């Protein structure tokens, strides 16, 4: 039986039509008994969605990757891809990362816009794809999927990742693999919670629900009132995590990133986004690099010799 080769059939098609083409191709190839195998190359997550919807049981997805002179092929799990597509918050972005050199998971679209702009200020050639996972609980499963697909994956998250011990443990374990380092960062995280609780007169353990007044300390001005030794430990923990690819914003929430530099902390406001872009556009790389939270973020993205 013949083998059929098809190169980028989605070329020049809008996304909805690329998806429809995938559905039609999948259905027709399955019904065509004269064919032995069909090989389709694509750069379209929409064509891929169409193929998956029409012939998932007959489909084998292979991701090709080139790193310098090295080339490798990775067979992806259909079960994992179907699980990803079945998520209630599924976006084509999740599959777009299959065609990218690197995925950067962030909490929401605003985060993606700001961090993309910020990193491009230091590296205009950065080609990683910023993927919004709609909140911290999405980090773990999507990071695991990209790991299994052979895609380099980083995470940028607000500081309040640390206010939930369980989520912090599961996400940080994806980046920190040695028990001694895991125990080290967990002890720092727990010491920080104890301090915030004592500061507000709300004693309790990790299993007790954290009062909102305690949670507020994770939102912005997170170093305020911290003892020097605890502040140093938190800083060292954040730098360690960043070097491994997990960036925890040391200023608190995204909206606190430029707060100390005149960009007012405003929760859920488009005005903040406009002001943040204006701030980045009007300040040099050296000035941006002097912001502590930015300096930590750069450890995950910019080689040390280029950081200045």
Q: Where are the regions that the model predicts?
A:
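Switch/communication elements of ASCE P-loop NTPase nucleotide-binding domains
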Residues: 1-96, 299-307
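Acidic, Mg2+-coordinating catalytic modules of nucleic-acid enzymes
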Residues: 87-105, 109-308
């Amino acid at each position: 039986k013949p083998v059929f080769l098809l190169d980028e059939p989605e070329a020049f098609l809008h996304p909805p039509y690329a998806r429809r083409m995938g559905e039609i191709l999948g259905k027709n190839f399955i019904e065509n008994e004269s064919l032995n195998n069909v090989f389709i190359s694509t750069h379209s997550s929409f064509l891929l969605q169409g193929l998956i919807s029409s012939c998932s049981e007959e489909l084998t997805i292979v991701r090709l990757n080139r790193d310098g002179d090295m080339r490798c092929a990775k067979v992806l799990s259909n079960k994992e891809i179907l699980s990803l597509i079945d998520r209630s918050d599924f976006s084509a972005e999740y599959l777009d990362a299959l065609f990218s050199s690197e995925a950067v998971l962030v909490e929401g679209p605003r985060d993606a816009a700001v961090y993309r702009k910020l990193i491009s200020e230091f590296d205009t050639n950065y080609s990683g794809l910023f993927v919004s996972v709609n909140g911290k609980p999405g980090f773990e499963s999507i990071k695991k999927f990209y790991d299994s697909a052979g895609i380099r994956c980083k995470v940028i998250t607000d500081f309040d990742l640390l206010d939930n011990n369980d989520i912090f443990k599961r996400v940080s374990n994806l980046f920190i693999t040695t028990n001694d380092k895991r125990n080290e960062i967990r002890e720092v995280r727990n010491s920080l919670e104890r301090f915030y609780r004592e500061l507000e007169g709300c004693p309790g353990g990790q299993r007790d629900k954290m009062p909102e007044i305690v949670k507020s300390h994770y939102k912005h001005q997170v170093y305020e009132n911290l003892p020097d030794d605890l502040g140093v430990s938190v800083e060292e923990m954040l730098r360690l995590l960043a070097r491994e690819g997990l960036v925890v914003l040391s200023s608190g929430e995204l909206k606190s990133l430029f707060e100390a530099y005149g960009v007012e902390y405003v929760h859920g406001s488009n005005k903040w986004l406009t002001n943040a872009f204006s701030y980045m556009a009007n300040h040099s790389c050296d000035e941006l690099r002097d912001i502590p939270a930015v300096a930590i973020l750069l450890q995950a993205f910019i080689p040390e010799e280029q950081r200045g």
